[in-house]
């Protein structure tokens, strides 16, 4: 009898219950550049012109130990690709088909799973009102078209990543939740001051995102590993949902006219092992990371946990978390706007909010 086929939600719940992590893959753009392929207008073109390259990237990440694959569909939305060779829906469908093929080949070759196919999307590429001219409804419809295509193609979950505008991430999450049954992973990206481009801090992001009811929240991209460590601590301080941590391989540097990331696999693994001990459930990599970084991360974390692991590793159920007094502000109730949050209740007296 074969192994049980988990849904992503079932697998995540099982890992949290048993105090085990979930591993995501690393950079896609990093690997495309490393392949040396040229002659494409956008990375998503390779889904049609060189699907074997994208499939091999997925297989390399599965060999490195990841559970969740990220589709080559980051920029595939109808607004951004209005004048491209294929529709956004076609790019997305092809990206999921490549993932499914890669998973089938990897598991047939004995690469241990489970493995999950994810539709991946980033920002649309235009600012929403009031900072830009794109309306909320236009953003919603754009995300709706491609997430529906992803589900039809067989995606196991949706990853909404590298978001800097909470208004836009709201459009994306609602589009997925209202039009598909896909689990939702939503991650923000932060500047050096630990705020998004539109000014929201971690507490505001957590408050806002959790109200939209995704399955997982967290951050990706950003700056140094030290900044990533502080973001991890802040997310885990306030979040009630599982947290995904996907930092870059450090800050990019220009060497001989080329942009490179100098953090090697062992250093990346060390940083992620610390983030895991803080309580992160889901871990992966972003810009500059490759299968070497992911393999080092997986091996280091599994080695650490084989010698000393307890159920306080998870952060979604509250088990193992230190009880913090309400007056500390962590277990309090918050309301938030676009880029600000306000604690209410507790021993702070009445709060008057003018809008």
Where is each model-derived feature located?
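Domain-level signal for soluble alpha/beta catalytic cores
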Residues: 1-355
């Amino acid at each position: 009898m074969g192994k049980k086929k988990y849904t992503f939600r079932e697998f995540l719940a099982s890992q949290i219950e048993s105090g085990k992590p979930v591993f995501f893959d690393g950079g896609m753009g990093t690997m495309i550049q490393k392949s040396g392929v040229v002659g494409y207008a956008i990375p998503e073109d390779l889904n049609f012109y060189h699907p074997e390259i994208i499939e091999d990237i997925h297989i390399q990440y599965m060999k490195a130990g990841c559970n969740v694959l990220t589709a080559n569909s980051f920029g595939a939305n109808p607004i951004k690709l209005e004048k491209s060779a294929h529709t956004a829906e076609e790019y997305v469908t092809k990206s999921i088909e490549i993932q499914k093929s890669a998973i089938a080949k990897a598991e047939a070759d004995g690469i241990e799973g489970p493995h999950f196919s994810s539709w991946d999307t980033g920002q649309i590429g235009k600012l929403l009102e009031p900072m830009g001219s794109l309306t909320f409804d236009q953003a919603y419809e754009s995300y709706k078209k491609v997430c529906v295509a992803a589900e039809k193609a067989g995606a196991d979950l949706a990853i909404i990543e590298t978001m800097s505008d909470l208004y836009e991430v709201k459009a994306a999450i609602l589009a997925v939740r209202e039009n598909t049954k896909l689990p939702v992973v939503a991650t923000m990206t932060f500047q050096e001051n630990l705020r998004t481009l539109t000014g929201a801090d971690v507490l505001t992001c957590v408050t806002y995102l959790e109200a939209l009811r995704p399955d997982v929240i967290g951050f990706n991209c950003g700056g140094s590993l030290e900044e990533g460590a502080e973001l991890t601590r802040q997310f885990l301080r306030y979040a009630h949902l599982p947290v995904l941590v996907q930092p870059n391989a450090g800050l990019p540097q220009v060497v001989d006219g080329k942009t490179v990331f100098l953090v090697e696999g062992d250093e990346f693994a060390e940083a992620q092992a610390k983030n895991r001990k803080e309580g992160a459930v889901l871990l992966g990599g972003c810009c500059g990371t490759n299968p070497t970084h992911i393999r080092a991360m997986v091996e280091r974390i599994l080695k650490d946990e084989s010698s000393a692991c307890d159920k306080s590793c998870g952060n979604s159920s509250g088990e193992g978390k230190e009880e913090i007094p309400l007056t500390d502000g962590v277990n309090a109730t918050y309301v938030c706007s676009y880029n600000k949050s306000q604690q209410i209740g507790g021993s702070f007296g009445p709060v008057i909010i003018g809008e």
